[in-house]
Amino acid sequence: MEEFTGIGYFYKKSIKNQLDKKDASLLWELPYYTLLYLANCVKKHNNSNNIDLCSIINAKSGLCSENCAFCSQSLHNSSKIKEYPLKPKEDILKQAKYIEKYSNRFSIVVSGKTVNDREYNEIIDAIKDIKKETNLKVCASLGLLDNSQLKELKDLDVRIHNNLETSKEYFDKICTTHTYDDKVKSITMAKKIGLEVCSGGIIGLGESLENRINLFYELKELDVEGIPINIYNPIKGTKTYELLNNNAIKQITPIEALKSIAICKLILPNKDVRLCGGREYNLRDWQSLSLLAIDGLMIGNYLTTNGRNIEDDIKMIVDGGFDGK
């Protein structure tokens, strides 16, 4: 570290969007509080004191054909969860109306590699109703979509969500029924059409620091607008849970998670880094510190796990001096 004049070196490179992988590895050696301070300085450089709030509805749960090792909705895992087909559009609209008083964004999320024609058309109807009856920005996580579907979603001003989940070199350790390149192809197609894309991953799946940093740079190369960071929440019955239970991989620590979030922001200074699932379980009493480095927060319940009380999250944001919603 002696070759650098101090943390100002990293700050200057970050605001110029010029941090390289060597810089990112060196950043890891800094204390978590220094990294959070740096990330917050970068946020303030971009005149951002805001924490943009989003929420999701698990509109179709379980029975997924894909074998993602971390996912409780996969048929290849044995987790005990609620399974149900696509919810009626009335239920989706009801949830959207409820969350509007707290959130800017609302995402319709479904299980599965993709949606069939009937499901797709029903989701389109639900999106139109939400657009008509609320002021929410609408997002959708519908798996791998074709060109015509993406164009229709673009016309409706919908942001697409499609997580890479992890880096290219680690992807086949967590999923083999579809590929990393399948995801990249879908994201690239969406970007080419002009859609905004939210794509991030899950940290704490047993990946190395190098894997994690590579994921952040892969997202940077794809030029996605939003980067949701999830922290793996062990759910019994998933293969990743068994790896943790057998000590084949280590549980991520709160400090490791905070450092990863801060480094992500420093690598992607002009993008919206959003903290999502697993924060309650993994960060515990350290959750408020994450606000220094993030641009957005997912509130409410997640896919198959509960979030914490929304009012508590709002209070945390206000108490920290941040602007919410």
From Swiss-Prot:
It is an enzyme of class 2 (transferase). The keyword Iron applies. Residues 46-270 form the Radical SAM core domain. The gene is bioB. One of its GO terms (biological process) is biotin biosynthetic process. Keywords: 2Fe-2S, 4Fe-4S, Biotin biosynthesis, Iron, Iron-sulfur, Metal-binding, S-adenosyl-L-methionine, Transferase. SMART domains: BATS, Elp3. It comes from Methanococcus aeolicus (strain ATCC BAA-1280 / DSM 17508 / OCM 812 / Nankai-3). The keyword Iron applies. Its EC number is 2.8.1.6. InterPro entries: Aldolase_TIM (IPR013785), BATS_dom (IPR010722), Biotin_synth/BioAB (IPR002684), Biotin_synthase (IPR024177), Elp3/MiaA/NifB-like_rSAM (IPR006638), rSAM (IPR007197). Belongs to the radical SAM superfamily. Biotin synthase family. PROSITE patterns: RADICAL_SAM. This is Biotin synthase. It catalyses: (4R,5S)-dethiobiotin + (sulfur carrier)-SH + 2 reduced [2Fe-2S]-[ferredoxin] + 2 S-adenosyl-L-methionine = (sulfur carrier)-H + biotin + 2 5'-deoxyadenosine + 2 L-methionine + 2 oxidized [2Fe-2S]-[ferredoxin]. Binds 1 [4Fe-4S] cluster. The cluster is coordinated with 3 cysteines and an exchangeable S-adenosyl-L-methionine. Pathway: Cofactor biosynthesis; biotin biosynthesis; biotin from 7,8-diaminononanoate: step 2/2.
